[in-house]
């Protein structure tokens, strides 16, 4: 078979790929030399580098149909042709067989499809199947338990991924920089719509209960705009950015996040989150937060924006409405008829007519004409065991202070503070002595064991208690992000990359939380139904085990081998089908010109 003849060709690099161009030589009479002109794109080097297989454009194949019978590769400066067989492969390609780690990514694929994540990604990143690239990087973070992107090429070489073509660290950096705020917000809206739709399909019309909390992500990059020194929750002596998340309590699925400067206190961030949710059209939700986010301003903002809430109020603020309500109900909270058998705490609910300004105007005084009111439910709880533990703990601390004073030993900072709070100092001649002020001790213990939850939505004290207790899920989400996935450092040097990488890490955390939730629910079912085979491994070990389910790659496709025993049970525990041995056709990963999302 005669080797095709090619016109003069040149390779040009774009941000995403190397392209093949034809050109014509023209003569420059002034410089008295020829130069290249009339460039025309005719193909793409599919490897992403200067050397590799060339995919010819359709118009060039129409001009030179003989090229259809050959595979053309660029090696050095030469173009090497290899004849193809009837299946469109060379003999060497037909003989090539490769083993890929595939079970874990197969399971993750099924979980993404079953959840609202898959459709939300397609909505946010529709161009050029970019959602597959984003998803592949997220899988890398989940299975590698590391966000160091330089390790991705080695991982991808041996792993079945949604995007099977090579992605070099520089390409991944460009993907991060292309992820903009608009696409992230589109993802949030689509994700929430999908989650509500799934709840409706199973007859659940309740509002989404979203646990709210924040964490700090440390950074060595001092030049990033949002990196500031603040109260680091990991006690790292490093600048940080703060990351706030909303996590749906029942499914464990994170549906929103926002980053903010590392020196911004928690209580100031909720107002912006409430405004973001209102602007994005995220409705039918109840925010559940801890004491760090409660306050009059945040209650008013929720009411103005029609966002439901369940806030844990601070009990230690002297003269506050919270303390006033506790004092009013103190006797009722000793009545055994007020003790709930399920939560095992005493509980009382009070309805308060809350007055607020729906449309505040700066420097304008609020009046009765401009004010509105809303009925709020203040749920007051008392736990005797917590109160007794606090009492015993305080007595032990007081005893240590008295012992050190008697032995002439120095007090540490906390002990010195306690000395000033509950002891009376007596000076007589040159002698100094201390006595315990019982009134101060009683005042310090007065509000221990009490909790006050306020809501505009949840009128039942028991349901409010359970909804608050379920906010542990957001703590578990942060542990997944920072410990299990190794994302306690961002490892980026510019703000554009930080935006994109934070989103991909959030996506990886979301998928990992689905895995954890599925395994936890399966474990609960096993306790109820002894016929189900118990799975004792944690989520990381389950994915590691499934990652050893191999897939054979051959020319033009893939197939799974036989899967038996424990690994079949692991697929069952995750609620996904076991992959069968039917061949899976290889996708076409040839890239077109790079575009913005």
Question: Locations of the language-model features?
Answer:
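Active-site beta-loop-alpha junctions of metal-dependent nucleic acid enzymes
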Residues: 258-280
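Basic, amphipathic alpha-helical segments enriched in Lys/Arg and hydrophobic/aromatic residues
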Residues: 494-515
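Short, glycine/acidic-rich hinge or "gate" loops at secondary-structure transitions
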Residues: 519-533
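Secondary-structure transition/capping motifs at alpha-helix termini
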Residues: 29, 159-165, 182-183, 202-203, ...
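Short amphipathic alpha-helical "interface-anchor" segments enriched in bulky aromatics
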Residues: 464-491
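Dynamic "connector" segments at or just before major functional cores
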Residues: 1-211, 215-221, 244-256, 263, ...
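Acidic, metal-coordinating catalytic cores used for nucleic-acid/nucleotide bond scission
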Residues: 288-297, 315-318, 496-499
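An anionic, glycine-rich sequence signature occurring as long contiguous blocks
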Residues: 239, 259, 308-467, 537-597
């Amino acid at each position: 078979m005669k080797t095709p003849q090619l016109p003069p060709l040149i390779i040009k690099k774009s941000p995403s790929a190397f392209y093949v161009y034809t050109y014509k030589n023209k003569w420059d009479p002034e410089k008295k030399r020829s130069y290249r002109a009339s460039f025309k794109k005719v193909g793409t080097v599919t490897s992403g580098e200067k050397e590799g297989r060339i995919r010819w454009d359709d118009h060039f194949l129409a001009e030179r149909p003989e090229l259809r019978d050959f595979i053309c590769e660029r090696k050095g400066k030469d173009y090497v042709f290899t004849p193809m067989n009837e299946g469109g492969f060379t003999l060497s390609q037909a003989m090539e067989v490769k083993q890929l780690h595939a079970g874990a990514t197969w399971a993750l694929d099924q979980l993404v499809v079953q959840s609202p994540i898959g459709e939300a990604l397609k909505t946010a990143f529709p161009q050029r199947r970019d959602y597959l690239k984003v998803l592949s990087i997220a899988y890398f973070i989940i299975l590698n338990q590391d966000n160091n992107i330089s390790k991705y090429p080695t991982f991808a070489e041996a792993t079945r991924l949604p995007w099977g073509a090579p992605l070099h660290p520089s390409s991944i950096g460009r993907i991060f920089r292309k992820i903009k705020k608009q696409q992230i917000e589109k993802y949030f809206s689509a994700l929430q719509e999908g989650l509500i739709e799934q709840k409706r399909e199973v007859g659940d019309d309740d509002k989404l209960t979203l646990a709210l909390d924040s964490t700090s992500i440390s950074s060595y990059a001092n030049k990033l705009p949002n990196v500031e020194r603040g109260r680091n929750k990991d006690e790292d002596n490093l600048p940080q950015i703060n990351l706030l998340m909303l996590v749906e309590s029942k499914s464990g699925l994170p549906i929103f996040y926002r980053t903010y400067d590392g020196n911004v206190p928690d209580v100031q961030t909720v107002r912006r989150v409430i405004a973001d949710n209102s602007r994005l059209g995220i409705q039918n939700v109840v925010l559940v937060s801890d004491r760090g986010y409660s306050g009059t301003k945040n209650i008013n903002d929720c009411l103005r924006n029609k966002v439901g809430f369940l806030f844990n109020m601070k009990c230690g603020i002297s003269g506050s409405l919270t303390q006033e309500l506790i004092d009013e109900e103190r006797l009722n909270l000793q009545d055994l008829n007020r003790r709930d058998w399920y939560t095992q705490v005493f509980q009382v609910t009070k309805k308060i007519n809350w007055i607020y300004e729906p449309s505040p105007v700066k420097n304008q005084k609020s009046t009765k004409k401009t004010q509105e009111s809303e009925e709020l439910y203040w749920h007051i709880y008392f736990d005797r065991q917590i109160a007794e533990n606090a009492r015993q703990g305080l007595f032990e601390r007081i005893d240590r202070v008295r012992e050190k004073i008697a032995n002439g030993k120095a007090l540490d900072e906390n002990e010195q503070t306690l000395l000033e709070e509950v002891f009376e100092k007596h000076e007589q001649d040159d002698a100094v002595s201390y006595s315990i002020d019982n009134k101060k001790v009683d005042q310090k213990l007065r509000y221990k064991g009490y909790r006050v939850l306020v809501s505009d939505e949840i009128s039942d004290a028991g349901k409010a208690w359970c909804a608050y207790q379920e906010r542990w899920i957001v703590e578990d989400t942060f542990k997944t992000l920072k410990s299990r996935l190794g994302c306690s450092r961002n490892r980026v040097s510019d703000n554009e990359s930080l935006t994109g990488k934070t989103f991909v890490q959030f996506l990886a955390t979301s998928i990992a939380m689905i895995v954890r939730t599925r395994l936890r629910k399966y474990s609960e079912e096993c306790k109820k139904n002894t016929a189900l085979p118990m799975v004792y491994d944690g989520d990381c070990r389950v994915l590691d085990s499934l990652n050893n389910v191999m897939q054979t790659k051959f020319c033009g496709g893939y197939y799974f081998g036989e899967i038996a025993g424990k690994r079949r049970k692991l697929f069952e525990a995750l609620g996904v089908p076991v992959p069968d041995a039917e061949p899976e056709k290889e996708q076409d990963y040839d890239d077109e010109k790079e575009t913005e999302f």
